[in-house]
Every structure is written in structure tokens, then in C-alpha cells.
Amino acid sequence: MASMVMNVLCVAVACMVFSASYADAISCGQVTSGLVPCFGYLAAGGPVPPACCNGVRGLNNAAKTTPDRQTACGCLKGILAANTRINLNNANSLPGKCGISIGYKITPNIDCSKIH
């Protein structure tokens, strides 16, 4: 679990360094922070912690614009690439378990430029 968190944090830092910074724009740091309580569920399933759904709903509320949603998508791709232990079925069921719809399937090769 510690190595997964370290991988995610490295991806988040890389995304923050290489992405444009806007005052109101969502960042990979925000995406990572929102998903940290979800890592156990994403890897192993089981009950979704309330803190996880709070983070997921917070990210959904923060990603109001198309650029924000595309950035969040890119961050999710980076998290998937860095963490091979994440179960894609768990990742794709998470939004629904938290009562939201993100409008796309989470995959390692999603074209985030098509997210609107």
C-alpha cells in the first residue's frame, strides 16, 4: 500500500510540474488528494469508505469546465499507469457507488481530449 501511495504522489507531482497552472483550475494534486481514501477500495474492492466518496464528490464538483474534466481525466490516466494494482472494475464502479456519473469509462488508454 505504501508503494502505491508513493507512486500516486510521484504522478501527482509530475502532473503539477507539467500542467498549466490556473487559479481556479483543478490539479493532479487535488485529484490525488481526493482519491487517497479510495486506494484500498480501488485495489481490493470491499466497502467504499465515506471519506472516499466525499473526495470523489468533491472532485466532481471541482471539475466544472471541460478543461478541468480533461485535466482530471489525464490525472486518472497517470494514476492508473503508476499503479498496476488498481482494479479497473473497481475504478469504474466507484463513481456510481458514490452517487455520481462522470460520463466516461476509466481506462489506461482513454483519449481525454474527447471528454467534455
From Swiss-Prot:
Pfam families noted in UniProt: Tryp_alpha_amyl
Record-annotated disulphide pairs: 28-75, 38-52, 53-98, 73-112
Keyword Signal assigned: yes
GO biological process annotation, one example: lipid transport
Record's keyword annotation contains Disulfide bond: yes
Ranges that cross the membrane: none
Cited InterPro entries: Bifun_inhib/LTP/seed_sf, Bifunc_inhib/LTP/seed_store, Plant_nsLTP
UniProt GO molecular function: lipid binding
Keywords: Disulfide bond, Lipid-binding, Signal, Transport
First and last residue of the signal peptide: 1-25
CDD domains: nsLTP1
Protein role: Plant non-specific lipid-transfer proteins transfer phospholipids as well as galactolipids across membranes. May play a role in wax or cutin deposition in the cell walls of expanding epidermal cells and certain secretory tissues.
Family to which the UniProt record says this protein belongs: Belongs to the plant LTP family.
Protein name: Non-specific lipid-transfer protein
